[in-house]
Amino acid sequence: MRDTDRERPLGLHPYPGMDRHRRWAIITGFLGAFLAVLAGILPVDQDTTRVQWTAGPDYAPVTAPLVSGRPLDLTITAPCAPLAQVPENTIVFSTLPQDAPGRISDGLVVQRVRDAAGDPVIEVAVRNITLLSVPLSTLRDPACETLHVRAETGILTAEFTGLERDADDAVRAAVPGSMRPQVTGVFTDLTAATAPDGLGESTVEVTVDSRYSSSPTLLKLVLMVIGVLATLASVVFLHRLDGIDGRSGRRFVPRSWSRLSGVDGVVIGVLGFWHLVGANTSDDGYLLTMARSAGPSGYMANYYRWLGSPESPVGWYYEILRVFAEVSTASPWMRLPTLVCGILSWLIISREVVPRLGRLARTWRGPRWTGAALFLAFWMAFNNGLRPEPVIALGALLTWSLVERSIATRRLVPGVAAIGVAAFSLGAGPTGLMCVAALAAGAREFVRMVRRRAQVVGWAAILGPVLAVGLALLYTVFADQTLAAVLEATRIRTELGPSLPWYGEKERWEALFGVSADGGVARRFPVLLMLMCLVLVSAVMLRRGRIPGAAAGPSRRLIGVIAGSLLFLVFTPTKWTHHFGVFAGLAGALAVLAVIALRSSTVSLSRNRWLVWAALCLVVGLSTATDNTWWYVSDYGIPFSDSFPAIGGVQIQYVAFVGGFVCLLIAGLIHSGILPDDPGAALRVRIRQAVPFLRTHADTPASRRRDGGSGDTA
């Protein structure tokens, strides 16, 4: 902290109690950051579960589906003599039920069958591999004691104990590697009436892989609560330190938020209507099952793709679905967070983004309606399901809005809040990486502001809250998991995939331009229109240095955010077109800016207007060069769901391409001077020049002047 007024930045002055606030900002900030990092190694309570099944006396099967699919270990023991007396074609033990399609290929089966020579044998098979096939005569040997099967990590063994090894070692087998069978219970064809005497002593023991079924200890819970409170306190003290500029703080939610306009009513009404009748996303089914199974299993397990590993470190959003599933699994109820995100996204656009983009955006209704149209086009096509894209779309828009507010108000707290929102957006899904682009767009102005204020309050008082807020996501990542569990889940994801490199991004665009639900009309059109708007505003910005009628700084940063987001999208491990849903909010803001750019003199030139029309025709043509396909049952009864859209038997794409070619041709003729700069104005002049030849002498301009000046009223 500087001691002299000469060294203190102009306009920043200490206030009474500043030193106390500075000390507490340092203490609470670094304490919150330290406890967030510590959360991953704090102790947890892990439940170890074992399933023990004894065959007799009723031989009742037990259903025990495992969240992880495969156990840590499995042990089967059965006496030899009774085993030799089971009826023919009988399954003695199985880890999958009779009608399971993968009973032999995925499970473990002990059964009596006949071998290739027609002799009766007891066969032990695991995952399509026959470990043992021993004749019944061998089992009747008094030396044979028990069948012992042991499956554990790294090896699978099966043997009939008590028998001497023979040359072929037919009574013992071992298979290295992870050959543990899939287990959904213990099943048998035997009943109390058909089972031989003595077989009731058989046992099956399963140790459940419950490494992820853990809960925080009291120590961990207390420390995490302290860390969260310390983080919130550090933000409060940083807010107090923002007062060194002598200005009063702004309302967090301006009064204008409570006033609804006509466009607000239309957007909210469309979102509500589409919430009830609109199409869902392709992953809603398995995400709903994950949410329903999270309660009994004790954690959010991804059974669908990654062997029941937890949705961590990205996936806190699914915990919200878990809470909702405990109330009801009705589709409108489960998708209520999506609707809330949509409404909040539009309110941010209309109340934060539009005023920030300048005077013309505030006073002219055209940009607001255009932004609403593109926002709804994105939201209805991509964001009406259970996937996390709506949360990330809201997070990206809110991050950029907070950055702009921080720059406009010259306050640190909005910028720090933007860092926290960006972190939680990244924690909702890999596409949340786009929020880094929003932070990077305003980084220069924010760092300049931090350096200026650090000369008065010190660096530690600012960095402490920044670190605490940025690392607060770790409290959700390690709420009931350990660092080891999260690293294991990450390893499983990387090994099993899909985990595509950055240069695999072409697959996303190939899917978008493919004829499928991934590249349907509804998905392709908003993405291409967003790209067209991006090219338009970038061209005007490069030509004029700014967009007339729009604020220069926010306009440049918005362009940078969207361009950077498209760049960061290549680093996501999966390449699905539904990821484009994260652009819903930013695309709406870009549409507002694009309409303002159309009024500039750069685009007002006749040649450039025709080029814009040609680009729009190209977007329509490319968007309709596919089926109007939606996912699953949402495709029932949809027009053109199995054909390209057409009017009167003529495909729209051809009409659009022809129109685009005509517009491009006119622009070329104007550029070369063959046509005048404004063909419409030139045509009107030609018509006016021809009018005297069509009028009577009494109706000429000269006669009208003469008659008007005579004063004759007869």
Predicted features and spans:
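Juxtamembrane membrane-water interface segments that cap and precede transmembrane helices
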Residues: G200-Y212, V314-S328, T494-A522, Y636-V650
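Start-transfer (signal-anchor) and selected internal transmembrane alpha helices
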Residues: R2-P43, S210-W274, V354
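Transmembrane-helix motifs of polytopic, lipid-linked glycan transferases
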Residues: L336-W364, T370-G371
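Transmembrane helical bundles and short interhelical boundary loops of multi-pass, membrane-embedded
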Residues: R607-A714
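Perimembrane helix-loop-helix junctions
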Residues: L402-S406, M434-L467
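Short hydrophobic/aromatic helix or loop-helix immediately within or flanking a transmembrane segment
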Residues: R292, W306-C341, S425, G432
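Hydrophobic, aromatic-rich transmembrane alpha-helices
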Residues: P526-G549, C663-H671
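Membrane-embedded helix bundles of polyisoprenyl
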Residues: W364-S406, R410, P414-A440
